[in-house]
């Protein structure tokens, strides 16, 4: 791939969008049942192993608006992958629970997902991946600071 003659910051900024678009197209063809954005919401919900997250918890972790995440959660609920339950400690609060159908989807795709990740990061050293994670976390912190200015 031939890169334009820009400084690294501008190249990286543009590459974020390009990779995001390519991953969305590839991801949407990966699953028959769900979109890649729906998959990401499921992954985020799954990280809350010990307790069910609220919509706000998921929206914050996804990095999207409450309204956008609610639309995705509603679609996943309609498809039977999620269930909305009341918080037993605060009946005003709704929590998101993965269903057995969702857990089956995860099991059915586990091997295919592992193969996808292996192919996606083929030829990339562990040290390089660690550096990318550090840079992404730093960028995330910078974005939060910029939002609060």
Locate the predicted segments by residue.
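Hydrophobic structural patches
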Residues: 16, 42-45, 136
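Alpha-helical linker/hinge and terminal dimerization helices associated
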Residues: 16-19, 23-27, 62, 105, ...
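Charged, amphipathic alpha-helical coiled-coil/dimerization segments
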Residues: 74-133
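N-terminal helix-turn-helix DNA-binding core of bacterial DNA-binding proteins
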Residues: 24-65
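N-terminal leader segment of winged-helix/HTH proteins
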Residues: 1-32, 79-81
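N-terminal positioning helix adjacent to the helix-turn-helix/winged-helix DNA-binding module
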Residues: 8, 37-38, 101, 128
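C-terminal regulatory/oligomerization modules of transcriptional regulators
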Residues: 1-4, 127-149
């Amino acid at each position: 791939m031939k890169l334009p003659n820009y400084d690294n910051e501008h190249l990286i900024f543009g590459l974020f969008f390009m990779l995001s678009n390519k991953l969305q197209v590839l991801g949407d063809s990966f699953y028959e049942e769900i979109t890649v954005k729906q998959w990401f919401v499921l992954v985020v919900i799954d990280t809350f192993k010990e307790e069910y997250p609220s919509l706000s918890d998921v929206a914050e972790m996804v990095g999207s608006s409450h309204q956008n995440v609610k639309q995705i959660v509603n679609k996943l609920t309609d498809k039977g992958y999620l269930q909305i339950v009341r918080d037993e400690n605060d009946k005003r609060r709704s929590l998101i629970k993965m269903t057995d159908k969702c857990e089956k989807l995860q099991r059915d795709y586990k091997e295919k997902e592992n193969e996808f990740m292996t192919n996606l990061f083929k030829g990339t050293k562990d040290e390089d991946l660690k550096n990318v994670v550090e840079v992404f976390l730093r960028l995330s912190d910078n974005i939060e600071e910029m939002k609060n200015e």
